[in-house]
Swiss-Prot record:
Belongs to the HHV-5 UL9 family. It comes from the Viruses. GO terms for cellular component: host cell membrane; membrane. Glycans are attached at residues 40, 94, 101, 131, 169. Residues 1-20 form the signal peptide. Disulfide bonds: none annotated. The keyword Membrane applies. The gene is UL9. The chain crosses the membrane at residues 194-214. This is Membrane glycoprotein UL9. It is found in: Host membrane. The keyword Kinase does not apply.
Length: 233
């Protein structure tokens, strides 16, 4: 009778534990976690549970015995389930679950549970859920086409335009230089005329004096006047 009384508390504990795990898994929110194809991802346990609990478990899809991936008890790794298909994982000593070489089959829910096994009363599990989604990165090449409002100009056309522009500049410079020369020559001729005319006048007077032209002209004038006076008398 005493043995039955000793076994009854353990049966009650196991019953409430399984019931508590079921309802917790149904109500616990899952943290979205993104992984990338062909890479690994690490899922970490609850930090506060590492100090107060002594049983730790990792599950896939939902907390059931057949879905258990890792089991730690009394700070030791007891079990790693190798029968779960289509995924590769590793249970580390610090209670971290590592999912390796991710593919689309890893896009599932992963549950972490911990509770204190030794002690009195019904254990209350601490739960954590990760909702893993696997993404694949693809390299995309973008080609940008730039349209222009102006038609393309060939190299030959550019050279012709450049040469024409150069010739125009040269012609304009030559005309301007020629006009400047004409103006300068006109100014020079004007200045020469201004001093040549007086010089010619002076030279003419000197020549007339040398040939006694004024004396001869005066004599002619006197004779003409005297002849006029005789005719009048």
């Amino acid at each position: 009778m005493s043995k039955r009384l000793q076994v009854f508390p353990w049966i009650t504990i196991l019953f409430y534990t399984s019931k508590s795990q079921y309802w917790n898994y149904m109500t616990i929110p899952c943290t979205p976690t993104v992984g990338y194809g062909s890479h690994n991802i690490s899922l970490h346990p609850l930090n506060n549970s590492l100090f107060q609990d002594d049983v730790f478990e990792w599950y896939i899809d939902k907390p059931m015995v057949t879905n258990k991936l890792c089991l730690y008890q009394s700070n030791e790794r007891i079990k790693s389930n190798l029968d779960s298909p289509n995924i590769m994982w590793q249970c580390t000593d610090n209670r971290t679950l590592i999912l390796m070489n991710l593919t689309t089959t890893y896009s599932r829910n992963y549950y972490f549970q911990s509770f204190k096994y030794l002690g009195q009363g019904v254990p209350k599990p601490n739960n954590l859920c990760y909702n893993v989604s696997v993404h694949f990165t693809h390299q995309t090449h973008c080609h940008t086409t730039t349209s222009s409002l102006y038609p393309p100009t060939s190299v030959h056309d550019s050279l012709e335009i450049s040469q024409s522009f150069t010739s125009t500049n040269f012609t304009h410079t030559a005309v301007h230089y020629a006009a400047g020369n004409v103006e300068a020559q006109h100014d020079t001729a004007t200045s020469h005329t201004m001093w040549i005319i007086p010089l010619v006048i002076v030279i003419t007077i000197i020549v007339l004096i040398c040939f006694k032209f004024p004396q001869k002209a005066w004599n002619k004038f006197t004779q003409y006047r005297y002849s006029g006076m005789l005719a009048a008398a």
